[in-house]
UniProtKB/Swiss-Prot annotation:
GO terms for biological process: mitochondrial genome maintenance. This is Genetic interactor of prohibitin 5, mitochondrial. Belongs to the GEP5 family. It comes from the Eukaryota. It is found in: Mitochondrion. Keywords: Mitochondrion. Essential for respiratory growth and required for maintenance of mtDNA. Required for cell survival in the absence of prohibitins. GO terms for cellular component: mitochondrion. It comes from Zygosaccharomyces rouxii (strain ATCC 2623 / CBS 732 / NBRC 1130 / NCYC 568 / NRRL Y-229). Pfam families: GEP5 (PF17053).
Length: 277
């Protein structure tokens, strides 16, 4: 909802949006969300103000990304299920004791943490939907072991894809290990249970934010729209602007075949990354 004070500013904000060197489809979507959300209106107004002040196109790129990669880009079905069953997944999140490395003959090949750090696909084969002993017993169990395992595989397949394609990640950063690693105290025993519970909560929150917000897959509809803008816009500057804004695009290849998110998704870099302008 838009507050009454901000509602008075919407016409002026709409005029500012229409004056930006953005494609008309982007302008339409921005205006729609500004009319219906005070928070989004403020974000758009801030980016417009910074662009007008500095004449820096990175603020236009930010508007394109907010529009086509977040606000008008729905979560794929498996991420909606991640959101729906977040607390239950926290109770079953994969983990590894750091002390277990001491008993391994070759931790580099046996440790789940090392397999993830080294980007080894073997890490995906060891996922199990098993309730750990730090679980919150007040959470109602709704997923069967098969459903939970499938959902974990969907989540971790997206994570593995991003880890294997660091250039597509937000800020081109290396992403952390997605499992919980339970550390040791200096004396060699495990840390307190309350701290371990917080590790599970933080880890699932970090993975959710990384997959759903910082690096959300682009819908095939939006990939097609952005592809048309990049190839058919009248000015080269607009084509280049949209291609820069889409430099981290990737999609779920079996998106339309699984509306309920019951299959493990497959991913590929966006075709718009390869388009010549």
């Amino acid at each position: 909802m838009v507050s009454s004070n901000l509602q008075e500013l919407i016409p002026a904000l709409s005029r500012s949006i229409r004056q930006l060197p953005l494609h008309i489809e982007t302008q339409k979507v921005l205006e729609f969300y500004c009319r219906n959300s005070s928070y989004k209106s403020l974000l758009v107004a801030q980016d417009i103000s910074e662009f007008e002040k500095h004449n820096d196109h990175k603020y236009l790129e930010a508007l394109i990304q907010k529009t086509h990669f977040l606000w008008d880009n729905p979560l794929p079905p498996f991420l909606k299920r991640f959101q729906l069953y977040h607390k239950e997944l926290t109770n079953h999140w994969p983990y590894e004791y750091q002390r277990s490395l001491l008993s391994m003959s070759n931790p580099r090949k046996e440790s789940q943490g090392y397999l993830w750090r080294d980007g080894k696909e073997l890490a995906l084969s060891n996922l199990r939907f098993e309730k750990h002993r730090w679980a919150d017993e007040n959470i109602i169990e709704r997923l069967s072991p098969e459903q939970g395992t499938q959902l974990l595989h969907s989540i971790f397949h997206q994570y593995f894809f991003l880890k294997s394609h660091a250039r597509l990640c937000y800020n081109n950063r290396k992403i952390p290990v997605p499992i919980v690693e339970i550390p040791l105290r200096p004396m060699g025993n495990d840390v307190a249970d309350c701290r371990i519970r917080n590790l599970f909560k933080r880890k699932t929150a970090v993975v959710w934010n990384l997959l759903a917000w910082e690096n959300r897959p682009l819908s095939t509809r939006n990939e097609q729209l952005l592809g048309e803008i990049i190839t058919k816009s009248e000015t080269r500057s607009m084509r280049r602007l949209y291609q820069r804004a889409s430099r981290r695009a990737y999609v779920v290849t079996n998106e339309g075949k699984d509306p309920n998110g019951l299959q493990v998704p497959e991913f590929r870099p966006g075709e718009i990354l390869q388009m010549s302008i």
